Curated annotation (Swiss-Prot):
Record gene name: Ddi2
Function as written in the Swiss-Prot or TrEMBL entry: Aspartic protease that mediates the cleavage of NFE2L1/NRF1 at 'Leu-104', thereby promoting release of NFE2L1/NRF1 from the endoplasmic reticulum membrane. Ubiquitination of NFE2L1/NRF1 is a prerequisite for cleavage, suggesting that DDI2 specifically recognizes and binds ubiquitinated NFE2L1/NRF1. Seems to act as a proteasomal shuttle which links the proteasome and replication fork proteins like RTF2. Required, with DDI1, for cellular survival following replication stress.
Active site per database record: D252
Lineage summary: Eukaryota, Metazoa, Chordata, Craniata, Vertebrata
Name under which the protein is recorded: Protein DDI1 homolog 2
Keywords: Aspartyl protease, Chromosome, Cytoplasm, Hydrolase, Phosphoprotein, Protease
Localization per Swiss-Prot or TrEMBL: Cytoplasm, Cytosol; Chromosome
Length: 399
């Protein structure tokens, strides 16, 4: 069931969050889960439902009458100092807990139970800024809650990996390291906000901190609302033939001219037609040397034979790229809804290739055992395989 928790801290700050729990979830586990979300130690929390405080930690939430969609109130108890305090009747009562002190954690992080402070060193106290001193309990709660576990995998992969490894020591180590890092960042934030407002360096750091927060918030919203934006898409390739040789061509409407690699031109036996007077440098994301230009050749797409010209590049990982000159010449249109390339001058269409049929250099992953191979090496291997196959065909055709 989904419960909404309205939290009121000791300094009267408020926060609201939702928790997905089972009906048989015991109250003490629910307190620990609220501690994880709000930062209020379980020993200092008071949970109220229907104007009635919930006190028996071993009773289930359902036994208190809680059901899906209910709202509970979480209050932080006031500190009870056993030491006799000197009464100053003429002085007003001032709460100093909300004053930020440079170099220390926030007020909620400093309020630790006395029993824990007696057995914890200062380093251990700094490592548990939110009172999460029981990694085993936290691990059990996360494993018992698939929703929280999926959020952990999405937002904190290192901690999720340590959790799923089954090693409690590793999980505790990663958790403590992240808590210490969070405490250091919080101390740095407090130091910056407490610095001289006219200090340009401090203001620049505050500006950078705000910018990073905006980036994180933007990324969190994107992961929740549009997770598909983090995926990768396969590029648009089609099957065609040049001089009778099969070629996988990349369709790129953003390229000005149609290009072909030198290796592909050699396989298609059109290097003899290269006009080297058209040599130059192709500039885009990078620069590559243009060997020359083939002024006219035929490209077969499905059953159509289309006239096309190629600029031959010396070092090009892909075999052929159909640029805007060829696409406009034949009035081609890219139909992403049907996943086809439509040839406007003939009315025919060809389907874009799935990722499994793309050349190695265009796949999102080069495949098992080929992660370290560069696209240039793959092109050389394909050229060697094509030459070997051509030689074998010539041997078989001999009488």
């Amino acid at each position: 069931m989904l419960l909404t928790v309205y939290c009121v801290r000791r300094d009267l700050s408020e926060v609201t969050f939702s928790l997905q729990v089972d009906a048989d979830f015991e109250l003490h586990n629910f307190r620990a889960l609220c501690e994880l979300e709000s930062g209020i130690p379980a020993a200092e929390s008071q949970i109220v439902y229907a104007e009635r405080p919930l006190t028996d930690n071993h009773r289930s939430l359902a036994s208190y009458g809680l059901k899906d969609g209910d709202v509970v109130i979480l209050r932080q108890k006031e500190n009870a100092d056993p030491r006799p305090a000197v009464q100053f009747s003429n002085l007003p009562r001032i709460d100093f807990s909300s004053i930020a002190v440079p170099g220390t954690s926030n007020p909620q992080q400093r309020q630790l139970p006395r029993t824990q402070a007696q057995h914890s060193s200062p380093g251990e106290m700094a490592s548990s800024p939110q009172g999460l001193d029981n990694p085993a309990l936290l691990r059990d709660m996360l494993l018992a809650n698939p929703h929280e576990l999926s959020l952990l995998k999405e937002r904190n992969p290192p901690l999720a990996e340590a959790l799923l490894s089954g090693d409690l020591e590793k999980f505790s180590r990663v958790l403590v390291e992240q808590q210490q890092d969070r405490a250091r960042r919080e101390q740095e934030r407090i130091r910056l906000f407490s610095a001289d407002p006219f200090d340009l360096e401090a203001q620049a750091k505050i500006e950078e901190d705000i910018r990073q927060q905006n980036i994180e918030e933007n990324m969190t919203i994107a992961m929740e609302e549009a997770p598909e934006s983090f995926g990768q898409v396969a590029m648009l390739y089609i099957n065609c033939r040049v001089n009778g040789h099969p070629v996988k061509a990349f369709v790129d409407s953003g390229a000005q001219m149609t290009i072909m690699s030198q290796a592909c031109a050699e396989r298609c036996n059109i290097m003899r037609l290269v006009d080297r007077r058209w040599a130059g440098i192709a500039k885009g994301v990078g620069t590559q040397k243009i060997i020359g230009r083939v002024h006219l050749a035929q490209v077969q797409i499905e059953g159509d034979f289309l006239a096309c010209s190629f600029s031959i590049l010396e070092e090009q990982p892909m075999d052929m790229l159909l640029g805007l000159d060829m696409l406009k010449r034949h009035q081609c249109s890219i139909d992403l809804k049907k996943n086809v390339l439509v040839i406007g001058t003939t009315g025919s269409q060809t389907t874009f290739l799935p990722e499994g049929e793309l050349p190695e250099c265009a796949r999102l992953a080069y495949g098992t055992g080929r992660e370290d191979i560069r696209p240039e090496e793959i092109a050389d291997q394909e050229l060697a395989e094509a030459i070997q196959k051509s030689a074998e065909d010539a041997e078989r055709q001999k009488p």
